[in-house]
Structure formats: C-alpha cells, structure tokens
Amino acid sequence: MSSLASPGRIARVFAALHARREVAFIPFITAGDPDLETTAEALLTLDRNGADLLELGLPYSDPLADGPTIQAAATRALARGTTPGAVLDLVARLTPELRAPLIVFTYFNLILAVGIEAFVERLAASGASGLLVPDLPVEEGDALQTAANVQGLDVIWLVAPTSPPERLRRIAERTTGFVYLVSTTGVTGARTQVASSVRTSLAQLRALTTRPVAVGFGISTPEQAHEVASLGADGVIVGSACVQLLATAAPEERLGQLAEFCRQLKKASQTLPVKS
C-alpha cells in the first residue's frame, strides 16, 4: 500500500544539505527507457550513489522542452507501451525503498487526460514528493497548484535566463521545494560549457527569494557540475547525460556506469564550499 506524499520533504533535503554546506545533486531519467524494470533499477542505483533528489520524466509524444536525447528516449519508451499509469505504479512500488524524494516531470496534456485533481491525487498516493510541468505557464497554474497543495505535493516552476524581473518574482513566490533555473535558452541537452547568464540569473533570484535554486538544462559533465556549484547554486540537475548513458551502455554494464557517473557528479558539485 503506497503512502501519501510527505509535505516539505524536498525543502527538508535542501535544509539538511545547506547545514552541511553541500549542493544537491539531482539526476533525471526518462521512465520506460529502455524498459520500466531498468528504470526501477536505475532509480535505486542513483539513490544509493549520491543523488539527493530524483527526477523521473513521463514519456510524451511532443516534449517541447526536451532536446534530441530525451525526445528519443521518450519515443522508445512510448513504443514499448509505457503509460503514465504504469509509471506511477512503479513509483508507488519504489518510493518506500528510496532515500531521495522523487519529482515527476510531465507535460500538461498528460495531466489533463485524467483531470488535474485525479492526477495529483494519484501522484501523491504513489509517494512522489513533487511535480514539474515545463509547458504550463505559472499564470495558468492556479488549479494545479491548489490541487497539489491539498495533497502536500511541491510544484516546481521553471525560470529562464530571459525571464523579466516581474516574472522571476511571481515564480519565486509561487514555487515550492525549489526554483528550477534553466541555464540556457532552448531545449534540454548537453552543452560544451555553462552559460554565462547563470551567475546573473542566480543573483537576481537571490534578491527575490530565500528558496533554494537548482540549475538544469545543458549540464552534462563533472566539470560543469563543479562550475555551477561554484557559482552558488543550491542544486545541480543532470538529465540528458544520464539518459544517454542508459541508452548506449551495454546492458550488463549500464548500472555500474550509472553509479560511477552519479558518484563523480555528486563529488564534483561539492568540490568548493558553498555559501554559509
């Protein structure tokens, strides 16, 4: 029997890390690629090798925020018949074993297909701790936010380098758990370097909110994780690189490689002391 989501779990993780002067490492993978059983094993592997929070993407046929790597993973998962219901069943089975809170990344049409309240209720019952919907503007998110609040789920909103100050303020006020700072314009995917705008965006958010800020999109190497942490981010999110590893590694080697990659990223993001 699955447990209801624990309100504030994500915030408590960040508070504990802050007290230890650590930065959160947050990996992302796509559910169902290459299959749901591997997804389960990958989540457990990440959880046991340094992940502080976990992001799990529901595969969707038109993932506008995602680059080629995650789009391809979603296509493969859908071709295997992966459904949101099957993924949430998997989450319910796994969350009692996970140390790290789990955040579900989904496009809004998948929520609308079953209804906002019904989706959020089932997500909370699965034991997930948060929800991230990249294609839902905060201005249109009242119904989702209200339903999530009732169920004790965090709703994490994204801000972009191009977001004007008033929009930054609105999102900083509305988000719970943490603010997701998109490091660059465009879609997800590995980049060769961290965008110079990250430092400026972090400073703008610091002036508006005391909530943790995690940086994602385009971070794919330990060196980049180190750089983002050194700029003062509270969390480092790595997605496409994890998805690519699961897609390309030999089946008998993928979990071992994922564990090592996770440890490297966690260690790299702690190399410099963070703010007191």
UniProtKB/Swiss-Prot annotation:
Enzyme Commission (EC) number: 4.2.1.20
Highest rank taxon of the organism: Bacteria
InterPro entries reported in the protein's UniProt record: Aldolase_TIM (IPR013785), RibuloseP-bd_barrel (IPR011060), Trp_synthase_alpha_AS (IPR018204), Trp_synthase_suA (IPR002028)
Keyword tags: Amino-acid biosynthesis, Aromatic amino acid biosynthesis, Lyase, Tryptophan biosynthesis
Enzyme class: lyase
Function in brief: The alpha subunit is responsible for the aldol cleavage of indoleglycerol phosphate to indole and glyceraldehyde 3-phosphate.
Protein name listed in UniProt: Tryptophan synthase alpha chain
Taxonomic source organism: Gloeobacter violaceus (strain ATCC 29082 / PCC 7421)
